[in-house]
């Protein structure tokens, strides 16, 4: 039962803030997190990780922590190529960013913008999950409820449930909410109950009483 399980806490990524220097300082000075997610890596076609991205994921910069690299892309081949590169550095779990609400990201149909293309997202996950399973790697997904309406999540969850996701990290807002408005906890509850993968909460941490009653993971 959930009440008998220890709540796990993850450090959510924040671009320009939660790089390896911050992660190491937090890990040394405060209560260690169960997982640390990197600020998103944004692969370019036929290109390796940038110096800045590589510096952030180097094992020697992340000792003693369970670190999960996060990738922001809508191109399966770019995701897979980057996952292979990360595997060479010892990583076995990768997170897909489907939550970023930034206008410059969404306009390219990445992050939360990818949620508006469910058929393309389905094909992306089919290709990525097939390749990663063969590589012995695991995929987790960070998602919102939808692009403009929480009603979109019913169809999105059907897509997610087709694949062997390690975790589904659910931010119960839509893209147009950005980080404002009240998290849609009924929708989160539906996602928690309906997901084949373990569900992790992401959003306003002031809702801890509701999170603890439903969930074992907080991001």
Which residues does each predicted region cover?
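Conserved radical SAM core fold
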Residues: 41-45, 73-76, 99-112, 172-177
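Non-catalytic positions within long, well-ordered alpha-helices that form the structural scaffold/packing
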Residues: 27-28, 87, 161, 213-214
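Glycine-rich, positively charged N-terminal anion/phosphate-binding segment
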Residues: 14-85
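Conserved small/polar residues in nucleotide/adenosyl-binding loops
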Residues: 208-212
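Alpha/beta enzyme core
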Residues: 84-93, 124-177, 185-194
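Active-site-adjacent beta->alpha loops and helix N-cap segments on the catalytic face
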Residues: 47-48, 103-126, 177-189
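Glycine-rich beta-strand-to-loop/alpha-helix junction loops that act as flexible
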Residues: 97-100, 173, 200-205, 219
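Hydrophobic faces of well-ordered beta-strands that scaffold small-molecule active sites
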Residues: 9-12, 36-38, 67-71, 94, ...
